[in-house]
Amino acid sequence: IAVTPTVKEELPALAPRPYPFDSISRRDPQCRATLLADTKARVYDGKWESHYDRLRYGLYPALTATSATDGARRFEDLWESNYFALGLTQADFVRQVTPAALRQFMTDEQVQPFLIELLGDAERMELFLANVKPGDNLGNALRVWARLANDDAKELKGKYANLQVATALVFDQKFSFARARDPKHERFTVDALERYRYFRDNAQRQRLETDIKKLAPYELVWVVSAEATNEEMEWALKENDLRKLKLANGDQQKDWSEAYPMINYRMDFVTGAKPPKAPPGKKAYKPLAESFTRGTLEEILEVGGICMDQSHFGTTAARAYGIPAASVGGDGNRGGHAWFAYLMPNHQWNMGNGFRPFNEPRNLPGTGRYADGYANGHTRDPQTGRGIGEFEVQLTGDPKRRMKSHYEKAFRLRLAARVYAANTDQEGRYACLRFATHAAELSIDTWKEAAACLEDLGTKADHERWRSFLRDMRVAFNVSDEDKRWPDMLAIADGYAEKHVWTDPKMTPEQIFKECRQSYEVFMREKKRLRGDTMDKTRYDLIVVAAERTARQLAKDTTPKGQENLFFYLRHALQDNREHLPTFRGLLDNFYAAVKGNKKLERFYLEEMRRIYVREMEDTGNDVFRMKTVLGLIDVMLPYFGKCDEPELGRKLVHDKEKIQKELEKLKKQ
């Protein structure tokens, strides 16, 4: 049971004055010594609010005394002072962890020594803070980090700090998983220390494919989050076929992309038909009903599976070898699909797509993604548990991220911005954040923090200011470079524009329509430019977003003429993207909302929907995946005929549905 420790030395009294960070104080070793002594006292007495106030009020004059004309280099001289660096990182550390969470350790003798050491180390605090994300439980993360650090032998101290931070931020919440093919649906809970020891000890024994010590925490979260037991991962390290794979920057024999097709595809799992003949050296395959196992990596390799099994195997096996990897999924013309992605030795990701924003090698091997409308992938952030776009993963491969003159500088400017905010100086905060966006142009977090600051400024941030900000944002994400353009970020910029620019009363409806339609036209021009690669690279998902955004602007004109304009716009959007089933499906509801209540347009809508369906989607070509996808589409379409009180127009779809269902039943008997 934890007890309150006896503090032998007398704790320094809590002074009311701010800590001084002027030029003289920054060179005075006594100032740093005082801060360290006070910090230690706060660990025991928990008076963190007063400590934070003394820091934020003391740091602010030092920051404002610098010259704004120095731009992104504005605070570099300040950072040369260890005392200043300690004060600024401490301030943000206390703010983010919160005084309430820090008080939890007042009676925790296991964490207190670690916390005192950490609060005296600006570099380690900065490492931690730079990798924190919204939603992290930082109190729990610190408790986990202390446990990991305390487990290291003396000769290992400091060697695995990045691994410790990544593990702490992933395991700040209970980490558990269930195997997809386990009939018992048992959940396995992974212990943070056990997971840390697996990677630390195997790194020491040089059994991993990567040098864990050289990977950053934002990369290592894609390693320690393996949804497997340690026994499974130990099996992977010993499995002969996996041991033959090598991590490479390009396509070569036995590279890690081959982990995906190592799992034999079981079409009978999809159709319910009789099992195929097993490959040489494997046991005879059993029917689907008898093929369920506990779903371990070893069993998946033995039994085979479908794309989700291939993705899970490739991702988890890579992580077992210390390779950052992600299981990615998307929606295309043949339904949902899963593939995987992994980090190459050059710290860039092989996403299995054709996007090469950082001049990645052209000969990258595939990772299971189909060239059939799967240009957009999604995965789950292992640190927060939330779904994210694959572009957020690929952006971490920015070569500038590992350069101190870019992302580190930008983060330090963000730390300064938070001090300005704590002193109610929003303009100073915004200036710091804009310098930060110049230092790290492709940092999503920096741009979002700057946008949040503009929103906090309220009416002080007028439409022109927002327009200038978004212009810079689009330039940063290469709006004019067709080969390096980040379309997701352009969509995010449009979201801000809809909220803060297109609300300008000086803009006419025609001007707003022209601006909001621009992104839609950019994506459509891109599709035409790609030609043969259309289905492989076109971001149909963002075409839907752009079309919906344009439709919202047109819908503001509630006159009959306005409704007619909206109808024809959405009709063109549906026609322009008829080859991609998910896009067609995604536009239907907006199209219906545009015609609802107008019987003439409702009938036009139903006829147009049915016409495109018959022309583009009726023929499933005996492709079981396409059949199931079209079946799902019919289920989406049929209710619209009822809503428009035209059930007879939908009779053909009812007939097609019955036909596809019969064909799928036949496949089960083969």
Where are these regions (language model features)?
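Acidic, low-complexity protein-protein interaction segments
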Residues: D22, D45, D53, Y60-D70, ...
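Intrinsically disordered, low-structural-confidence terminal and linker regions
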Residues: I1-T64
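Charged, amphipathic alpha-helical linkers/stalks
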Residues: P357-A451, E455-G458, D462-H463, R467
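Hydrophobic/aromatic-rich core segments of domains that either
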Residues: A289-L297, M308-T396
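Extended amphipathic alpha-helical coiled-coil/heptad-repeat regions
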Residues: Y430-Q670
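Secondary-structure boundary elements
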Residues: T69, W79, Y83-L301
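Soluble non-cytosolic domains of exported or imported proteins
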Residues: L301, G305-D309, V624, K628
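A structural boundary/capping signal
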Residues: T6-R17, T316, E449-A452, D488-L490, ...
